[in-house]
């Protein structure tokens, strides 16, 4: 999120990724690619028609080769150029911990 001054206001670091995902919503099932990931949300690239305000359930294939990361409820916050920004609304505690651990390791490795 950008402030009118152009300064980034994000409180959580984002990790650029290329993780396959499957998702479903009200009368919608699709596939996509997560292009950036943070604890509170992600950006997804997909050919499916999503709308702001849609609610989705996601399963993200993580590089650790364990079971897919489960995001039980995510809300579409923005749409632009074939991508959508999702806010995670409900994530199981074990998946929340796994996501935070994965991000901490990956972001630490980049620094």
How does the language model describe each region?
Residues 1-111:
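Structured alpha-helical
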């Amino acid at each position: 999120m950008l402030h009118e001054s152009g300064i980034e206001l994000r409180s959580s670091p984002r990790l650029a990724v290329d993780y396959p995902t499957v998702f479903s919503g009200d009368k919608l099932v699709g596939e996509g690619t997560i292009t950036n990931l943070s604890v509170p949300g992600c950006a997804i690239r997909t050919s499916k028609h999503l709308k702001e305000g849609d609610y989705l359930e996601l399963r993200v294939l993580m590089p650790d080769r364990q079971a897919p990361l489960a995001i039980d409820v995510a809300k579409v916050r923005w749409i632009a150029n074939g991508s959508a920004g999702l806010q995670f609304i409900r994530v199981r505690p074990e998946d929340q911990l796994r996501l935070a651990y994965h991000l901490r390791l990956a972001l630490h490795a980049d620094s």
